[in-house]
Curated annotation (Swiss-Prot):
The keyword Iron-sulfur applies. Binds 1 [4Fe-4S] cluster. SUPFAM superfamilies: 4Fe-4S ferredoxins. Keywords: 4Fe-4S, Electron transport, Iron, Iron-sulfur, Metal-binding, Transport. GO terms for molecular function: 4 iron, 4 sulfur cluster binding; electron transfer activity; iron ion binding. InterPro entries: 3Fe4S_ferredoxin, 4Fe4S_Fe-S-bd, 4Fe4S_Fe_S_CS, Fe-S_cluster_ET. Its cofactor is [4Fe-4S] cluster. It comes from Moorella thermoacetica (Clostridium thermoaceticum). [4Fe-4S] cluster binds at residues 10, 13, 16, 55. This is Ferredoxin.
Amino acid sequence: MKVTVDQDLCIACGTCIDLCPSVFDWDDEGLSHVIVDEVPEGAEDSCARESVNECPTEAIKEV
């Protein structure tokens, strides 16, 4: 599984980072970005998909 963050939609609320710090972190501009090429198997169902579903601006997409 792969995920992306649309930087144009990200409002830096931090929800994804709080939910899934093994996949998301802050970038130099204070926005969320993906820090892994592939979501680790254990994180797919537990936090990555939850981050996709909980993002208030739908900036996170599963690809």
